[in-house]
Amino acid sequence: LYTGTGTIANFVSKQARQVIGIEYVPEAIEDAKVNAEINGIKNTLFFAGDMKDMLTQDFINQYGRPDVIITDPPRAGMHQDVVDVILFAEPKRIVYVSCNPATQARDLQLLDVKYKVKAIQPVDMFPHTHHVENVVLLELRNED
């Protein structure tokens, strides 16, 4: 989710039967498709549109429930509708990459109803600034 030019989607494509990327910026999606073609990747699908409008229960029903969701939202974090569809889809794992720890914490709290945090890794991609990328691995809670 929030795939940009498809860097992560194309990178993980060798480990998946199919990878779907959604991004708001149509030009970025065109670049994602070109990047897949240049690299001979044939198991990716990319869609342009507002995440809250694109990622719906109907979308999940049409393309299948994902085993893993990798999300890298903008600073504002994920829209509540996106969180709701993720909770509906129930992937086994979520990898949440964020440049805003505050909105990431808010979204993690929303996902906490079904997911537990397994690992957290901050990455100092912008040395000598207060900015940090944070990567969180979430796993679906067992229904015991």
Where are the language model's segments positioned?
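Rossmann-like S-adenosyl-L-methionine
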Residues: 1-144
